[in-house]
Amino acid sequence: IYCTPAHQYPLGVPMSLPRRMALLAEAERHGAWILEDDYDGEYQYDQRPLPALQGLDSQGRVIYVGTFSKVLFGSLRLAYLVLPRPLMEAFSRARAAFDGHSNQLQQAVTADFIRAGHFATHLRQSRLLYQSRRDLLLSELAEHCPELNPIHSGAGLQCAVLLPPGGEGRWTQAANALGLGLRPLGQFYLGEPRLEGWLLGFGCLDNQTLRQLCRRLGALMRTASDGLMDAADRDKP
C-alpha cells in the first residue's frame, strides 16, 4: 500500500489520525506492507505534525521513505529507508545488487551536518521562510483573485486553489498565453475531473515576484470574466 499521509499531492490534505490507525489495522489484517512516502513532511505550518505511520506501527508493517534532496538541494540525490528489522537483510542485498557505488562522501558529510545540529537549524529557518511565502500568497490571492478558493492544507511548498465550475479551461489557456504556466488540477485525474482549479507553487518565489504574479493573475481573470459577460450580452436576443 503506497501512501503519502503527511501531505497528499496535489491537494495537500494530510491523513487524519483515525485513518492512519485504520490503515495500519488493514495492513496487519491482510499481511500487507505499507510504503510511507513522507512527501513534504518537513514543511508543516499551522499545527503540530501527526505521528508518522512508521512511528505508530507496532506490527512492523511500514516501510518509511524519506529524502534530503528537497529539504537541502536537489542535486544531493540522497534518500533513506526506515525498515522493519526482518526486512533489513533482503533490502541490503537488493541495494547492493542495484547500485553498489553510493557516494560515501555525501553520506558522511550529511551525517556530520545532522549530528552538529545544522540540519535541525536549517529546517526551522526554511520552515519559517516557506510559511511566510505561503501566507503572502494566500493574502495576495484574497486581494487580487477573489474568485479563487484556496485549499488550506497547512503544509508543503504548493497550494491548490479551486475555480468556479467551467473556468479551468478558459482561464488556464489565457494564463499560459501570458507565460504564467499554471498547472490545472484536471491534469492529475485518471478519470473525469471532479474539481477545477490550479496548483500554485511558491517555494522558489521571492515576495516581490509572488506579489507581481498574483496581480497579473487577478488582472487576467477580471479581463477574461468581462469578456465572457460581454459575449453573453451579445448573445441575448
For each feature predicted by the language model, list its residue ranges:
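PLP-dependent class I/II
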Residues: 2-237
